């Protein structure tokens, strides 16, 4: 099975490799750098040497030293993942302090959301979203 961009999509039974919602297989140039990022920066739960749970998503990391880093957020395929928070400014600052790359500082999208972006060591973007329909409040903080 493929998504509209041609990426392989695999449906797995609930609980397979601890996946209960979404599992994302990611190639990384350095498993050591990715492990530091997931463990220390995101403070994700380590399931094994190359598998992490962050909220309801399980990331399955595969080391490939030849993997090209992400250089553009626009294009086909996976470009970023999103995490919902109550205070984007605080979450963004915390992730940057822990080692994430500051990709886009927090800003407000009308009355819909306050968002920002950070990046991992391979340049994969993470959207930090304070969505009004979920948090009720878009004030900075």
Regions found by a protein language model. Name each.
Residues 8-13, 44-76, 119-121, 125-133:
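Conserved short beta-strand elements that form part of the metal-binding/catalytic scaffold
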Residues 12, 38, 70, 102-106:
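Intrinsically disordered, low-complexity segments enriched in polar/charged residues with Gly/Pro
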Residues 43-49, 101-106:
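Short secondary-structure junctions
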Residues 1-8, 29-32, 76, 80-125, ...:
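Vicinal oxygen chelate
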Residues 17-18, 71, 75, 102-103:
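General secondary-structure edge motif
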Residues 10-48, 76-83, 129-141:
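N-terminal beta-strand motif that seeds the catalytic metal site of vicinal oxygen chelate
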Residues 56-57, 112-114, 141:
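Short secondary-structure boundary/hinge segments and terminal tails
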Residues 30-35, 46, 50, 58-66, ...:
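Solvent-exposed, well-ordered amphipathic alpha-helical segments
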């Amino acid at each position: 099975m493929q998504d509209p961009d041609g990426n392989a999509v695999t449906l797995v039974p609930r609980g397979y490799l601890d996946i209960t919602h979404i599992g994302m297989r990611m190639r990384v140039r350095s498993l050591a750098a990715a492990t530091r990022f997931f463990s220390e920066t995101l403070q994700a739960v380590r399931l094994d040497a190359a598998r992490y749970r962050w909220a309801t998503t399980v990331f399955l990391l595969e080391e490939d030293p030849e993997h090209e880093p992400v250089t553009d957020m626009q294009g086909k395929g996976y470009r970023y993942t999103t995490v919902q928070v109550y205070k984007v400014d605080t979450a963004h600052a915390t992730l940057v302090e822990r080692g994430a790359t500051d990709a886009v500082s927090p800003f407000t999208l009308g009355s819909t959301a306050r968002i920002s972006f950070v990046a991992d060591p391979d340049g994969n973007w993470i959207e930090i979203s304070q969505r009004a329909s979920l948090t009720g409040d878009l004030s900075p903080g």
